[in-house]
């Protein structure tokens, strides 16, 4: 029995090492593979069961030196890789967000009809849309028709056509009617008042003249015919895809360059150490 006790004790020999108390617990806890036995002034003694090795005592200086080497070797590489992945995710999100906000996708756009043929909107809206799309044609047509309208009203007032009763019938304010009656330049003011009252008719004539002019210019090859809506949408979609792919390729190239620079720096540090 006395011989068996030392023999069993030798088989259950324990390996320990000493670690400085001042080191942080979470940084060095992974090196301790057994429960804590002794906790005194400057050292903590931990033990782990081992079958062959006996008690092993390491100085606190050696433990700290090994720990610092491991921390210097591993964390920079892991940190840089995580940082580069984080930057890659942020840049990809920015590219997608900028491409989605700067350009509207053609699928989301409503199919816009020709404002000259669209009867579902008001006269003023048709005039505005026609001005945006056919401004070069609408402006000269509108100036010519407006000149004709004003000239007609002015000629009528000069020839003695009294339009004052007509203005009173349509409900023009009395102050304006009195100004037109008593002013020395009554003919011009009267013509201008009639010109403003006839605004809906003037806009209708302008839109009709613009439509006729556009058809004439297209038939003679002076204006290009707009493409069909489907072809236009397909072209816009292809352009948007090309822009997005170009931006993604640029960001990938930048990220690969940064990763290569980071790897080179990490390898250089390892060689120096």
From Swiss-Prot:
Please report the stretch or stretches of sequence annotated as the DUF1279 domain: 118-230
Name the membrane topology term: Single-pass membrane protein
The annotated regions of Basic and acidic residues compositional bias extend over 106-116
Entry's localization field: Membrane; Mitochondrion; Cytoplasm
InterPro entries, A to Z: FAM210A/B-like, FAM210A/B-like_dom
- Protein task: May play a role in the structure and strength of both muscle and bone.
Protein's name according to its UniProt entry:
Protein FAM210A
> What lineage does UniProt assign to this protein's organism?
Eukaryota, Metazoa, Chordata, Craniata, Vertebrata
């Amino acid at each position: 029995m006395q011989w068996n006790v030392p023999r069993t004790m030798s088989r259950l020999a324990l390996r320990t090492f000493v670690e400085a108390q001042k080191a942080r617990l979470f940084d060095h806890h992974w090196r301790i593979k057994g429960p804590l036995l002794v906790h005194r002034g400057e050292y903590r003694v931990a033990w782990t069961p081992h079958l062959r090795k006996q008690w092993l005592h390491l100085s606190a200086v050696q433990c700290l030196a090994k720990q610092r080497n491991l921390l210097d070797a591993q964390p920079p590489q892991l940190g840089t890789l995580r940082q580069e992945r984080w930057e890659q995710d942020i840049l990809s999100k920015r590219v997608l967000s900028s491409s989605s906000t700067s350009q509207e996708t053609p699928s989301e756009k409503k199919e816009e009809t020709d404002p000259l043929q669209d009867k579902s909107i008001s006269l003023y809206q048709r005039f505005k849309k026609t001005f945006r799309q056919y401004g070069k044609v609408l402006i000269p047509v509108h100036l010519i028709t407006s000149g004709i309208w004003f000239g007609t009203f002015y000629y009528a007032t000069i020839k003695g056509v009294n339009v004052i009763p007509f203005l009173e019938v349509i409900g023009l304010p009395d102050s304006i009617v009195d100004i037109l009656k008593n002013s020395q330049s009554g003919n011009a003011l009267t013509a201008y008042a009639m010109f403003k009252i006839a605004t809906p008719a003037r806009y209708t004539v302008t839109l009709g003249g613009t439509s006729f002019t556009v058809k004439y210019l297209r038939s003679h090859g002076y204006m290009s015919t707009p493409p069909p809506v489907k072809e236009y949408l397909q072209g816009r979609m292809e352009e948007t895809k090309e822009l997005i792919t170009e931006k993604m390729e640029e960001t990938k190239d930048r990220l690969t360059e940064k990763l290569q620079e980071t790897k080179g720096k990490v390898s250089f540090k390892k060689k120096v150490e």
